[in-house]
Amino acid sequence: MAAASAPVPGPGGASSTARGRIPAPATPYQEDIARYWNNEARPVNLRLGDVDGLYHHHYGIGAVDHAALGDPGDGGYEARLIAELHRLESAQAEFLLDHLGPVGPGDTLVDAGCGRGGSMVMAHQRFGCKVEGVTLSAAQAEFGNRRARELGIDDHVRSRVCNMLDTPFEKGTVAASWNNESSMYVDLHDVFAEHSRFLRVGGRYVTVTGCWNPRYGQPSKWVSQINAHFECNIHSRREYLRAMADNRLVPQTVVDLTPETLPYWELRATSSLVTGIEEAFIESYRDGSFQYVLIAADRV
């Protein structure tokens, strides 16, 4: 993504940007988003990451392990609930990585909208490869780079502040790339054109995203609430497929994860970490106006 206003230390104390400085936001909207995520410190993100040091900025999938949760009446229940939410979020990241295709230790991956870097760490641990992350938020990039140094993988995992629509990666050099709940901050044709540029022919692009359902007619009131809460612009499923086709990204797999993510939201709504947006997600998933999907596409 794009920029903020202060240098971001990278490995060895260097800036995390290619030019040794943080570029200015390209638009006022990018500046607003950088400010939003620089100031974000929700317990729902930080306390879940504290479970095992993987800090995510996406939601979870899969069945809730009620046996692991145990009795809601005992003193350790909230900690177990937090651990279970985190397990479901990591399961989502694993599912995304499952769809990246063949990746070797000599390859480079790109996480567009990398947050605090949890998925990047998981990708390196699985494939042994280099993982580059881009974000609008200087605070997120600094956090991700600090975590990489603590883990001793900063020679392979790096976050930088830059515009995901205008990255420094050379044409055709990236094996696979993804947007994990970050494509709602950009124009789809613009972001897919950039992925298509830096992906090698035969490379894989994956997105996991919430999208409004064209069969509903228009974005529902719940989708509008989500847009307002996160200062984003949720696209329709149809828009994703059309923009991919226009940019030489041919979908190979489309998975509707809506039934898989609803249990996560229903559990999160019972925790002390609620943010006020849980009802909008739950109701929009239930009424069919909002969907949670994975799309994996090959660069041709």
From Swiss-Prot:
GO BP terms, alphabetized: methylation; terpene metabolic process
Gene3D superfamilies for the chain: Vaccinia Virus protein VP39 (3.40.50.150)
Keywords assigned: Magnesium, Methyltransferase, Plasmid, S-adenosyl-L-methionine, Transferase
Chain positions covered by the region annotation Disordered: 1-24
EC number: 2.1.1.255
MF term (GO), any: C-methyltransferase activity
Entry cofactors: Mg(2+)
InterPro entries named in the record: Erg6_SMT_methyltransf (IPR050447), GPPMT_Stmyces (IPR049645), SAM-dependent_MTases_sf (IPR029063)
Keyword S-adenosyl-L-methionine: yes
Catalytic activity line of the entry: (2E)-geranyl diphosphate + S-adenosyl-L-methionine = (E)-2-methylgeranyl diphosphate + S-adenosyl-L-homocysteine + H(+)
Superkingdom of origin organism: Bacteria
Its biological purpose: Catalyzes the SAM-dependent methylation of geranyl diphosphate (GPP) to yield (E)-2-methylgeranyl diphosphate (2-MeGPP).
The name this protein goes by in its record: Geranyl diphosphate 2-C-methyltransferase
Organism: Streptomyces lasalocidi
Species lineage: Bacteria, Bacillati, Actinomycetota, Actinomycetes, Kitasatosporales
